């Protein structure tokens, strides 16, 4: 087996996304964080620009950094979902706001999505 077969990526899928399946009926479609995904680079630039000095001097709070990361993933990485419900079992429409809420409420899910992206 070659390194190329292990690490070469599909540039089309990096942008159009892949489905992550959780349980029997929950699908979350994600794009790649980086690589051939120009939307990710643009969103990171736009979201972090107001905080660049804090980021560079490492004075940005952990809470703000985590919030920015959730917003970036909600806007540039998660492309959609199906079968996602809130804590009461009510269907959650895919919106950026709902994605940020889900990431904040379920940090282990967010960690998994970050690892997969």
List the model feature ranges, each with a label:
Residues 1-14:
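Extended acidic low-complexity intrinsically disordered regions
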Residues 13-23:
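Short acidic-hydrophobic surface loop/beta-edge motif
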Residues 22, 26-117:
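Short, surface-exposed, charged amphipathic helix/loop patches that serve as local interaction elements
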